[in-house]
Amino acid sequence: PSRRMWLVVPLLAVWSNLHGAALLGLGVTLAYLVVQRARREPWIALAVAVLSAAALCATPAGLRTVAYYHGVLTNAAAQRGVGEWGALSLGSPLDIVLVLTAAVLLFGAWRARPRLWEAVVLIVLALLTVTADRDGVWLVMFAVAPAARRLAPARSLRTLTPIAAVLAVILLAVCVVRGPVLSQASPSMVTRALALAHGTPVLADGSIDEQVAVAGGRIWAGDPIDAFPHRVQEVYLDWLAGDADGSRALTGDVRVVLVTRGTRTQSLMARMPGFVAAGQADGVIMYERGGSL
């Protein structure tokens, strides 16, 4: 057995400082240690397991990181199974692509006769993906390694490896520079919204909440939703769904609302007494309490 498994400890520490999915990384590590490594080197496996778990807390929050992960797993969106926590849907083109990709890789992994611990991880990730499609990317990434063991590329194809690597780097650079394609409000609308809000929190949907935050404004709730109290999470999800209970988000000091046109949220705001449309641009409508126009 390789001693390189100790590298998982610093890797998990770095990962935990970047994204909450490090918890899945810990799960994969524990599966390997318990199912395979513990039979040969139980004490080493135990040491790596303990240090790996501790590595998740190697963040500025320290032991409070445990509360963060608890909040991630128990947030209102996860409990309701909505948004990125929603189940796979054949009505979603991206989910269909995910299912087809995962099916091909899982078939390849099965033919390669994965190790027992790999099979355990694949099964668990597959079940997680069915209940929450956000986990699908980790299923696909993990399945690549065992599936690739069945591949025996021709010598002539190996010369394409450097070309493929260069193209991948170029594509990655383009994606980083371009950024994600999101439904966004115009900068002028965000500026006006902050001016009308006068320091009060802005209620916004989609990626618009992130724009408001980046511009220095306050938001009533947004992504990541687990950063807000559970009661606020539930009301915000009701509001996003266009549910009448979501109107509770407007009973406080919210004066300005930004929504994407044509959504259920916009339909709710259109019939909300006390709020009037104060402008629209690029598919985003701004509502103001009382109105200034």
Named regions from a protein language model:
Residues 5-20, 28-31, 51-55, 123-129:
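Membrane-interface alpha helices of multi-pass inner-membrane proteins
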Residues 232-286, 290:
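Periplasmic/luminal catalytic loop of GT-C fold multi-pass membrane glycosyltransferases
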